[in-house]
Design a protein with these regions (language model features):
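Mature catalytic domains of secreted/periplasmic carbohydrate-active enzymes
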Residues: 1-201
Length: 201
């Protein structure tokens, strides 16, 4: 794929240099949340939404549930907290977008390996058990058709429970005015009575 070729050109082979290593390269040394928020406010914005996490399972805040986050890896900054403080300064409601729900199934591409060439059969770094918490033990989704985005959501019960804990963590840490999920609210019937014990099935 074009993405594979770009990765090899710019970073090296994914069996040797994977996404976890790319995350460590991100420094955000010029990131100025307050300066940007001032520009947005002056341009007419009256609310702000920051990304908490995308499909890559990297968190933009100091999570206790996921060590692959912007405080412990890469920038050394709590990006979400900085955005929240800037929004508060300008009196703007603050929202968080999360894209974690699809990550378990989507991340199956990191379990593959080249079928030809010098690295044929050498597992990509997503197979490294030392990073299983980040890359997931998601072999159940296979790697035969990595370009098929479905299933969008996994049936894996442990991951569903993890997703819910992450949502609770973000809400408790940042008290957002809005929490946006990418797509329909994940995993069908859950949270139906508003309690922690509501069905996740």
């Amino acid at each position: 794929t074009q993405q594979y070729e770009y990765h090899v050109r710019h970073y090296g082979h994914p069996s040797k240099f994977g996404y976890k290593d790319i995350c460590a390269l991100w420094k955000a040394e010029n990131f100025d949340a307050e300066g940007l928020m001032e520009k947005y406010y002056n341009a007419g914005a009256r609310y702000f939404m920051s990304q908490g996490t995308h499909h890559d399972h990297f968190f933009n805040y100091d999570s206790k549930l996921n060590a692959m986050n912007s405080v412990k890896v890469g920038p050394g900054k709590d990006i979400l907290a900085m955005w929240k403080a800037a929004a508060d300064k300008f009196g703007m409601p603050f929202g968080i977008s999360e894209h974690l729900g699809a990550s378990f199934a989507w991340w199956r591409v990191n379990k593959g390996c080249d079928k030809t060439g010098p690295y044929a059969g050498v597992p990509y770094d997503g197979n490294d058990p030392a990073y299983q918490d980040f890359y997931y033990a998601n072999q159940e989704h296979g790697t035969e058709n990595p370009h098929n985005a479905f299933p969008w959501y996994t049936e894996n019960k442990e991951f569903r429970e993890y997703w819910l804990r992450v949502m609770e963590e973000m809400i408790e840490c940042f008290e957002p005015d809005l929490l946006y999920s990418d797509g329909s609210l994940p995993f069908g019937k859950h949270w139906v009575d508003g309690s922690d014990s509501a069905s996740m099935e």
